[in-house]
Amino acid sequence: MQMFANPEVALAGLPGCTVGIEAEEGLLATLESLAKSIGCVPLPLPAGIRPLYHASAYYVGPFLIALLKEGAKLWAGFGASERQSMAALIPLLRGTVAAVQDAGLAKGMGGCIARGDMGTIQKHLASLEHVDSSAADLYRKLALRNIPLALERGSIDPGRARQIETLLDSTDKPVR
């Protein structure tokens, strides 16, 4: 899978990329061979699954860009330029990817949800509500998705998970 916003960058990034192939048996071997010949990793897909395969790519492609933009907007709130925010956030992104490559999704996750740090979560929510309630809503939705990872990681217990869920599901704005 590869982002094709800039063809030259995409071409340079092709080696090692997974290429989903949905084809009948006779054509499948030819397409797999073609994918391998350009350094890609072929992945045979069951019939009809391509939309789901491509939708999964959106989470770590265009949606990731949307999350970076959300981060840049928050940085703009304290006077930083988009360039400054990206100079700080891209290394964080690289470190996150490296942690996941090293330890897997759950063990590679850090942060306040992974620690079960209710105080920090409350501070995050309060500051986000203060500047942009839609950013706070996005934070809540994404944080809820981190709870099962923290449980799998073993860094929080089910009781703490319920407390975090309650805090995140709260319709009341946190006390500032």
Predicted segments, located by residue:
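Helical "substrate-binding/catalytic lid" subdomain
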Residues: 42, 48-131, 135
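C-terminal active-site/capping subdomain that shapes the small-molecule cofactor and substrate pocket
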Residues: 105-176
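A general structural signal for short secondary-structure boundary/capping elements
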Residues: 20-22, 65-68, 155-162
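Rossmann-fold dinucleotide-binding core
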Residues: 1-54
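Aromatic/hydrophobic pocket-lining residues that form π-stacking "cages" and hydrophobic walls in ligand
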Residues: 31, 71, 146
